[in-house]
Regions:
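Charged, terminal alpha-helix-loop-beta segments
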Residues: 1-260
Length: 260
């Protein structure tokens, strides 16, 4: 990042720093910034819970839970200076836990959050407002097989994380990596949020390619299953008809016909 010096008609480099070096914390700072202004992540989001731990039979807790404009649940995991190695597995667990939440449960979770932050507004009304004042009965929330998304936020991402995220995209798992960089100029601190995965210019292409790959995989599985079923059928049929000797020298096949 550079600062424009009007007097000298030049630009001056602004120092990028580590959060920890200036005493900034993950929960007290980064998490609160996103909770108060989620649009900093590059899209419209509605934060519906913070440090959510309402999962059955586990005490695990995710950082932030949000809704996007398509009604998907968005799991947001913050890692400050270093993403660490295990954040992907951690967030996938949270996404699986959230996959079973229905609309009423999501509304209840959001209402608990509003009550906790002493906001007197109604969760149903806030959700309706977020979805352009649609009636709550018309809003689809967390519906379908791929209605959970994940956003990772960190200053630096390890290769283990970025490689896994890109690979998972081939299986239609939607994970976004947002690089957050703090800068210091004098006594002021500036913060820049930059989506690095998927690259904005290639996001639509990546989604289409992931969908195509998934469709091709499903077709391949269907063909393989059909071939196996036909092979078993002809094997059993030939054995059953062995007393007539019509197919005595024939072998089972994966084709839908048997040549006499």
């Amino acid at each position: 990042m550079y600062r424009y010096d009007k007097n000298n008609n030049c630009i001056l480099e602004v120092e990028d720093i580590e959060f920890s070096k200036v005493g900034l914390k993950e929960r007290q700072n980064l998490q609160e910034w996103i909770a108060k202004l989620p649009n900093c992540l590059g899209e419209e989001l509605l934060i519906i819970q913070k440090e959510f731990d309402g999962f059955k039979d586990t005490k695990e807790r995710l950082d932030l839970l949000a809704l996007d404009k398509k009604g998907n649940l968005v799991i947001i995991e913050n890692k400050l200076d270093d993403s660490g190695r295990n954040v992907t597995w951690q967030a996938l667990k949270y996404a699986s836990y959230c996959s079973s939440l229905n609309k009423d449960e999501v509304i209840s979770i959001y209402q608990q959050y509003l009550d906790k932050i002493e906001n007197t507004e109604n969760a149903v009304e806030k959700i309706s407002e977020f979805f352009d004042n649609k009636d709550i009965s018309e809003i689809q929330i967390n519906e379908g097989g791929h209605s959970q998304r994940i956003i990772f936020v960190a200053r630096e991402f390890r290769k283990e994380v970025t490689s896994t995220v890109i690979w998972l995209a081939n299986y239609n798992l939607r994970i976004t990596c947002v690089k957050v960089t703090p800068y210091k100029y004098g006594e002021e601190i500036f913060v820049d949020f930059d989506k690095i995965i998927p690259i904005p210019e290639a996001e639509d292409y990546m989604i289409k390619m992931a969908s195509k790959a998934q469709q091709e995989s499903q077709i391949e599985e269907t063909i393989t299953r059909s071939e196996n079923e036909r092979t078993i059928f002809w094997r059993d049929f030939i054995a059953y008809d062995s007393e007539n000797n019509l197919y005595k020298n024939k072998k089972e096949t994966s084709e839908p016909w048997l040549t006499l």
